[in-house]
From Swiss-Prot:
Family of this protein: Belongs to the DAMOX/DASOX family.
Catalytic activity: a D-alpha-amino acid + O2 + H2O = a 2-oxocarboxylate + H2O2 + NH4(+); D-alanine + O2 + H2O = pyruvate + H2O2 + NH4(+); D-aspartate + O2 + H2O = oxaloacetate + H2O2 + NH4(+)
InterPro entries reported for this sequence: FAD-dep_OxRdtase, FAD/NAD-bd_sf
Gene: DAO
Residues annotated to bind D-proline: Y261, K332, G362
Group of enzyme by EC: oxidoreductase
Protein name: D-amino-acid oxidase
EC numbers on record: 1.4.3.3, 1.4.3.1
Gene3D superfamilies, alphabetized: FAD/NAD(P)-binding domain
Chain residue ranges for the region called Disordered: 109-138
Highest taxon of the lineage: Eukaryota
Organism: Zea mays (Maize)
Compositional bias ranges of the Pro residues kind: 112-121
Record SUPFAM superfamilies: FAD/NAD(P)-binding domain
GO molecular function: D-amino-acid oxidase activity; D-aspartate oxidase activity
Length: 386
């Protein structure tokens, strides 16, 4: 006889992974379970609210395990958009995706623009013919903050605002709940999910098994002079600011709201304790504005573009580049999901669905979680004698 599914699930982290886990727990066919979610500041207040929201079917195909996760998640995004009215609720839409080489210096172009280049992009912005990277069948987008909040709201989860101090573990090695700063006692749980992005490693139960590092990424959001002229074309740019300088790889995502999101300028850096204190670095923000102006006169501040946001966030990274999804070795009922790097919004749904199956059914069916198990790091530490 199989064990009964847990009745009390506490999710730590109100980003896309935590929200999707809450949704799939609550909508589980056989054992629907509405969880409690603990979030330090507000749902989607960190990377899940400041990411680009780009979705790709097959861009992870070079890594088989990640390919299966990404393809399952891309399909789930379409299903969720149908179920939750994603087009209106959080800007879900298929997009065209292009690779564009920006010239280092302004160039007057007498030749007609390349037919692949959308009309809102200046003809002089492309130093070579653009390449098609994705079609509306293989690439799409969401507004990540709105998506995260919509999925969380649909789950019906109780949201507790507070900082998770530690995971409480019973004498028999089974999870007992979480301790929240400033809250008396333990928030009882039969199962705990740690989905705290780059902050996951601050908890001892995680840091004893593996490390999570941060990658600081900058972004700006602009409202162009004529937003109605901006078409759903996502641009992956290559740009060398000066001869001999490092090649930059910024990205441009127009949104259905008429806003345009531009990101790039990343560096390895661990996040501060409080997500609410994160700010962008002036030089990185200035470079993104420079790049935006090279792409389109519609995106130049001096020509009427409105600055909606200048911001930064931290992406969670692991030593081997793969996410960590599964039960933490030695702590029965304590699960972790982090390390998705720049693919967190894409892979959030399949991660949440797989965790819900693992917690309620005892095994994930939507995708094989073995390659993502935190136990893989125990083997490596053992080989190193750690």
């Amino acid at each position: 006889m199989s064990a009964a599914p847990p009745r009390r699930v506490v999710i730590c982290g109100g980003g896309v992974v935590g929200a999707c886990t809450a949704y799939f727990l609550a909508t589980h066919a056989a054992s629907p379970t509405v969880p409690t979610l603990v979030e330090r500041c507000a749902p989607a207040c960190a990377a899940s609210g400041k990411a680009g929201g780009f979705l790709a079917l097959d861009w992870c195909d070079s890594t088989p395990a990640l390919s299966r996760l990404a393809r399952a998640s891309f399909a789930l995004h379409r299903r969720l958009a149908d179920a939750l009215g994603g087009a209106d609720a959080y800007g879900f839409r298929p997009v065209h995706t292009l690779s564009v080489l920006l010239p280092p210096h302004p160039a007057a172009s007498s030749s007609p623009p390349h037919p692949l280049l959308p009309p809102w992009v200046d003809p002089s912005a492309s130093a070579a013919p653009p390449r098609e990277l994705g079609t509306p069948d293989t690439t799409a987008q969401v507004h990540p903050g709105l998506f995260t909040k919509a999925v969380l709201a649909a789950s019906g989860a109780e949201v507790v605002i507070g900082e998770v101090e530690r995971v409480a573990v019973a004498w028999d090695g089974r999870v007992a709940g979480v301790v929240v700063k400033g809250r008396d006692g333990v928030l009882d749980a039969d199962a705990v999910v740690l989905a705290l992005g780059p902050w996951s490693g601050r908890l001892e139960v995680v840091s004893e098994v593996f490390d999570v590092s941060g990658l600081k990424a900058h972004s700006i959001v602009l409202r162009p002079r004529e937003p109605e002229k901006v078409t759903p074309h996502c641009l992956f740019l290559s740009y060398q600011p000066e001869p001999g300088a490092k090649m930059l790889d910024p990205e441009v995502y127009p949104r259905p709201t008429g806003e345009v999101y531009i990101c790039g300028m990343s560096k390895d850096e661990n996040p501060p304790d409080d997500p609410a204190t994160i700010t962008g670095e002036p030089d990185s923000i200035a470079m993104l504005h420079k790049i935006a102006g090279k792409v389109s006169s519609q995106l130049k501040k001096e020509e009427g573009a409105e600055v909606v946001a200048e911001q930064a966030c931290y992406l969670p990274c692991t030593a081997d580049g793969l996410p960590v999804i599964g039960e933490i070795p030695g702590v029965k009922g304590c699960y972790v999901a982090t390390g998705h790097s720049c693919w967190g919004i894409l892979n959030g749904p399949a991660t949440g669905a797989a965790l819900a199956e693992l917690i309620l059914d005892g095994k994930a069916k939507i995708v094989d979680l073995e390659p993502f198990s935190p136990a893989r790091f125990l083997k490596r530490r053992s080989r190193r004698g750690v």
